[in-house]
Amino acid sequence: MKGPSILAVAALALLLVLSVLENSSGAPQRLSEKRNWTPQAMLYLKGAQGHRFISDQSRRKELADRPPPERRNPNLQLLTLPEAAALFLASLEKPQKDEGGDFDKSKLLEDRRFYW
């Protein structure tokens, strides 16, 4: 019984190796090999892809040559911590003053119960 099963496993392994070799014959020999583009193909690609055709190295060089963009206004006056806290507390108190005393919160709670 061992003879036919060993023979079947060997045949399947050989078939697997041959199929892998057959499929890899169409693959390029070297991955680092660059394609020799004709000038006409270069123009086509540049038109089809726009600025995305520019190589990554030249794009990185352009970004490195540019000065970093200013993100802050140079004349910005920063608030101190007590000033920021006072401004925050004033903004919290402001809506309570605008509400007045005529707002009934029980109506809001009743409406919420119906939508559960």
UniProtKB/Swiss-Prot annotation:
Transferase recorded as keyword: no
Segments carrying the region annotation (Disordered) are 56-75
Which Pfam families does the record associate with it?
A: Spexin
Which residues are removed as the propeptide when the protein matures? 27-35, 50-116, 74-116
Pinpoint the site Cleavage: 35-36, 52-53, 72-73
Keyword Nuclease applies: no
Q: In which tissues is it expressed?
A: Widely expressed; predominantly expressed in epithelial cells in the skin, respiratory, digestive, urinary and reproductive systems, retina, adrenal gland and various brain regions. In the adrenal gland, expressed in parenchymal cells of the cortex and in ganglionic cells and intermingled cortical cells of the medulla. Expressed in the type I glomic cells within the carotid body (at protein level). Widely expressed. Strongly expressed in esophagus, liver, pancreas, kidney, brain, hypothalamus, thyroid and ovary.
Q: What does induction of this protein depend on?
A: Up-regulated by enucleation-induced adrenocortical regeneration (at protein level). Up-regulated by dexamethasone (DX) treatment. Down-regulated by adrenocorticotropic hormone (ACTH) treatment. Up-regulated by hypoxia in the carotid body.
Subcellular location field: Secreted; Secreted, Extracellular space; Cytoplasmic vesicle, Secretory vesicle
Compositional bias segments (type: Basic and acidic residues): 56-73
The GO terms describing molecular function are: neuropeptide hormone activity; type 2 galanin receptor binding; type 3 galanin receptor binding
What does UniProt give as GO cellular component? cytoplasm; dense core granule; extracellular space; transport vesicle
Keywords, alphabetical: Amidation, Cleavage on pair of basic residues, Cytoplasmic vesicle, Hormone, Secreted, Signal
Signal sequence segment: 1-26
| Modified-residue entries (Glutamine amide), positions | 49
Q: Record's superkingdom?
A: Eukaryota
Q: Which GO terms describe its biological process?
A: positive regulation of gastro-intestinal system smooth muscle contraction; positive regulation of transcription by RNA polymerase II
Role played: Plays a role as a central modulator of cardiovascular and renal function and nociception. Also plays a role in energy metabolism and storage. Inhibits adrenocortical cell proliferation with minor stimulation on corticosteroid release.
> Which family, according to UniProt?
Belongs to the spexin family.
Protein name per its UniProtKB record: Spexin
Where does this protein come from, organism-wise? Rattus norvegicus
Q: Which gene encodes it?
A: SPX
